[in-house]
């Protein structure tokens, strides 16, 4: 960690700015992605907003960490917990994204409840456990990066195998977004392994590009859906 601390004065402003922008982008995505759940009440739709909500929270915590507004020893655990669970929730959401059956709803409820039990336990342990050595942070940090990459890779493959990707132009851009996010996560693993500054900046650039694409696609889908609904209401033939 000493290498990171030594370079903080050089990049703290752009890093905090990027973390803040990333957090805001994720929270905007949550605003859009919560709508299908609000309309249908289907539990399978809650995974995406939860995933991006936790991801945004992890970026916000990261920004706070670099501004030194809170104790690093405590807050880094929350960052790792939220970052790990964000990608797990996203992967689970895509796994259960197909039209639900009675059995799949039951399995989803069990998995969803189990994830929240594990999340609550992890947060509780963060408060009651003694301070962990720096080596533990490095191990957990690397593990979370690997887990995140595995989850993103699964989402990418899942999107790639969807039959609607050829007909839906937006699906292709979602695939691009997750591809960029996978590159970002891979670069972060390289950065954690050998402190390559090229990998470090690649991580941030790919992340911003990914979130930008997701924002554009999500807004376009929401805007077109809303616009189409207004046209249907105005067209007397469709009343």
Predicted regions and their residues:
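Membrane-helix boundary/juxtamembrane motif in polytopic membrane proteins
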Residues: 41-44, 104-114, 135-143, 156-180
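Aromatic-anchored segments of alpha-helical transmembrane domains
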Residues: 55-60, 115-128, 178-188
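Membrane-helix boundary elements
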Residues: 1-6, 114-141
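Individual alpha-helical transmembrane segments in multi-pass integral membrane proteins
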Residues: 10-26, 43-114, 142-146, 197-220
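Juxtamembrane "helix-exit" motif on the non-cytosolic side of transmembrane helices
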Residues: 61-70, 123-136, 186-197
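Transmembrane helix-loop junctions in multipass membrane proteins, especially transporters and channels
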Residues: 34, 38-41, 67-71, 95-102, ...
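First transmembrane helix
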Residues: 6-38, 141-162, 223
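C-terminal transmembrane-bundle signature of multipass membrane proteins
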Residues: 152-239
């Amino acid at each position: 960690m000493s290498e990171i601390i030594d370079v903080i004065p050089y990049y703290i402003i752009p890093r905090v700015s990027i973390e803040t922008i990333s957090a805001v982008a994720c929270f905007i995505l949550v605003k859009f992605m919560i709508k299908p759940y609000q309309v249908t009440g289907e539990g399978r739709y809650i995974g995406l907003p939860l995933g991006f909500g936790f991801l945004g929270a992890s970026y916000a915590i990261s920004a706070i960490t670099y501004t030194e507004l809170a104790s690093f020893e405590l807050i880094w655990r929350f960052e790792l917990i939220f970052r790990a669970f964000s990608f797990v929730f996203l992967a689970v959401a895509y796994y259960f994204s197909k039209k639900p059956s009675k059995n799949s709803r039951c399995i989803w409820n069990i998995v969803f409840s189990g994830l929240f039990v594990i999340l609550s336990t992890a947060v509780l342990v963060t408060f009651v456990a003694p301070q962990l050595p720096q080596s533990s942070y490095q191990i957990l940090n690397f593990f979370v990066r690997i887990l995140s990459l595995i989850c993103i890779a699964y989402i990418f493959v899942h999107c790639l195998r969807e039959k609607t990707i050829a007909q839906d132009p937006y699906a292709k851009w979602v695939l691009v977004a997750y591809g960029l996010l996978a590159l970002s996560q891979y670069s972060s693993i390289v950065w954690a392994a050998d402190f390559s500054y090229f990998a470090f900046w690649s991580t941030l650039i790919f992340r911003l590009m990914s979130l930008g694409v997701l924002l554009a696609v999500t807004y376009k889908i929401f805007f077109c859906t809303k616009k189409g609904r207004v046209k249907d209401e105005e067209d007397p033939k469709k009343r």
